[in-house]
A protein has these predicted regions:
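Juxtacatalytic substrate-recognition/specificity segment
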Residues: 219-346
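An active-site-proximal "capping" alpha-helix that borders the catalytic cofactor pocket
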Residues: 85, 255, 349-361
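Early extracytoplasmic/domain-onset interaction patches
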Residues: 24-68, 154
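Non-catalytic architectural context of zinc metalloproteases
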Residues: 75-84, 88, 92-265, 283-286
Length: 621
């Protein structure tokens, strides 16, 4: 999690080729779980799901929706979105059921159960935008039901499992309006234009394959043998799949080149949902990884350059999850328990090393400059220092679902990435620049792979065997231990030192302190009174209490304040600007130029030229 593209050809495209075989003919004689999801005749914003039951030899059985799903690291309780749960025998008689907890139903007379049915509510329209770790489900892990327009099917929000039957094959039939098309990495085995049929080997495979139904807007391309599909839902049509494909192709080509032979994935799908940010739309932005897909949710109002930058950062992160945890993971992940999860100790690797790769590949492949990369690492140090720097990372990881560890989760993208960076530098130093952390991950992938998980307690020893004693000592001291990382020591090995320079900051925010607020009744944006304003306000003679009506002739209010803040991040020193305000009941038009506020920021620079070879091996090796 990080926690976020051509015209439909008649009958056949890369991901929509449909053989003439019928769904019925394809169903195996082996016992299966057959699921039907109806995206037609949607009533009260709910979707009907029917699940056929296998044979049971017990008097009762349970059916559960997930409490948690892989990659989210939060309790989400998808059962709370289920209504009108019923069980039937093969004559259509309703069987007695009861609720065990929010996610689980007990079905009596299990020997006679033929199917269960229920209605699914979506998650997008109940989000409050309260952020990670709250009651909100992270949007990329959520669901959307917008009849005849869009259905975001993260399968864990629609399909559950019978106790002890998760390993049976799942066959899923989805009926949908003819005007909508489902973007997914799965292969549709039904030739109908209103029914899709998908076969998966087990429940875990099903929930790792999201489908997004909308008016067809997608592109496909091939990069080094990998088939890639980019599917987009943009409510207003502002963004199209074709408009973002060149940058996505450049990025994914660079990623494939960076990974080399470590990557064997044959298909990959990026599902981009753009939110209107209305009261009933998604508000959690980012992405969620799957082995062969990524679901991405972003605000539709983003400027194209901002959208592309965000897409590159979050999609590249999710794509690198094909290394870990897809190819390298523990038993806790391989045999994931959706309702009584045991968490792995190695989030530093699953999320941290992945985040490091998502930044390293960009400098390695020439997508960003060295200065950009150093700035990103400096920001991660700043953010990590604001967290609990003595909490053992392995302890936090194993207990991430509960406090006080839960509140430290976001550090996996900060200190976790820095752990990966330090390991990379150590390995480069000890191997005279010949190898780095990517080589380590390739060895681990060869040792384990998709179907062979490792034991949590054995990973450090295995890594040490594949690398050097210094790597093992670092892991024990700074990852399993309480000792903060001396970043200066590791930067010095590649000629990098700390520097301080003035950097422009946002005109509307100083850290977490805003300079503006909103009148909840009038929805007007107000400059906060009785605080010291920065140079931007002083230069334009803006005062506390002024109501911001428009900037550069574009009106702003609560409805589009996010867009205003986003656009402000593109302003340059000296840009011409006009601000329409209301002061003491009278409207005024202020004209002037942008004067950005600056703050002293601790940065990083390459200063020791004697270490140029080591630095080049680290960043370009």
């Amino acid at each position: 999690m990080k926690k976020i593209i051509l015209t439909l050809l008649a009958g056949c495209a890369l991901y929509s080729c449909k053989p003439s075989e019928t769904a019925a003919a394809l169903k195996s004689k082996v016992e299966t779980i057959d699921v039907t999801i109806k995206l037609i005749d949607v009533k009260d914003d709910k979707v009907m799901v029917t699940v056929t039951a296998p044979k049971f030899n017990t008097e009762e059985v349970t059916y559960s929706m997930p409490k948690i799903v892989p990659g989210t690291y939060s309790i989400d309780d998808y059962g709370k979105y289920i209504d009108d749960f019923k069980a039937f025998d093969n004559k259509g008689t309703v069987l007695p059921t009861s609720k065990l907890d929010v996610n689980t139903w007990i079905i009596k007379d299990a020997k006679n159960v033929a199917k269960v049915t229920y209605l699914v509510n979506d998650t997008f329209d109940t989000e409050k935008g309260s952020g990670f770790g709250t009651a909100d489900i992270f949007s990329p892990a959520g669901t959307n039901i917008d009849a005849d327009k869009n259905f975001m099917l993260n399968m864990h929000g629609f399909v559950g499992y019978f106790k002890d039957k998760k390993e049976l094959p799942y066959n899923v039939t989805i009926s949908h309006p003819e005007t909508l098309w489902g973007a997914t990495s799965m292969t549709d085995l039904d030739a109908s234009t209103t029914n899709d049929f998908f076969k998966t080997s087990r429940y875990a495979e099903l929930v790792e394959n999201p489908v997004m139904y909308s008016k067809p807007d997608y592109t496909t391309f091939v990069v080094d043998g990998m088939e890639i599909l980019i599917g987009v839902y943009s409510p207003t049509g502002k963004v199209t799949a074709e408009s973002i494909t060149p940058e996505m192709k450049t990025m994914m080509t660079a990623q494939k080149t960076f990974l080399g032979k470590i990557n064997a994935t044959k298909k990959y799908t990026v599902l981009l949902y753009l939110s209107t940010m209305s009261e009933t739309d998604a508000k959690g932005f980012g992405a969620l990884e799957h082995p062969t897909a990524t679901t991405v949710v972003m605000p539709e109002m983003l400027l194209k350059d901002e959208l592309l930058k965000s897409m590159i950062d979050v999609v590249s992160h999710e794509f690198f999850h094909i290394v870990t945890p897809l190819s390298v993971h523990s038993k806790e992940i391989h045999d994931f328990d959706y309702n009584a999860p045991k968490m792995s100790k190695h989030l530093w690797m699953y999320e941290g090393v992945t985040e490091y790769f998502a930044n390293l590949f960009q400098i390695n492949q020439g997508l960003i400059t060295e200065e950009d990369f150093y700035k990103r690492m400096a920001e991660k140090i700043e953010h990590a220092n604001a967290m609990n720097d003595t909490m053992p990372f392995t302890t936090m990881s194993a207990n991430v679902l509960t406090e006080p560890y839960k509140e430290q989760y976001l550090n996996v993208y900060e200190k976790g990435a820095l752990i990966g960076m330090c390991l990379d530098i150590i390995i480069r130093e000890k191997s005279n620049g010949e190898r780095g952390i990517l080589d380590l991950m390739q060895k681990l992938s060869n040792e384990y792979g998709v179907s062979k998980p490792f034991n949590d307690n054995e990973l450090f020893a295995k890594i040490t065997t594949f690398t050097y004693p210094e790597v093992g000592a670092f892991l024990e001291k700074h990852v399993a231990g309480e000792t903060p990382i001396p970043y200066d020591l590791y930067f010095s090995k590649v000629g990098i030192t700390k520097t301080s320079k003035k950097e422009p900051v946002n005109v509307f925010l100083k850290g977490q302190m805003p300079y503006i607020s909103v009148d909840q009744q009038t929805k007007e944006i107000i400059v906060i009174p009785n605080i010291e304003l920065n140079d931007f306000y002083r230069n334009l003679d803006l005062k506390g209490g002024d109501i911001l009506k428009a900037i550069n002739d574009k009106p702003y209010s609560l409805e589009n304040i996010y867009e205003m803040i986003t656009i402000s991040q593109t302003w340059k020193e000296g840009d011409a600007i006009t601000v329409k305000i209301k002061r003491n009941g009278s409207e005024q038009l202020l004209k002037g130029t942008v004067k950005l506020p600056y703050e002293d920021k601790e940065g990083l620079s390459f200063t020791d030229t004697s270490k140029k070879a080591q630095k080049e091996a680290w960043l370009k090796g």
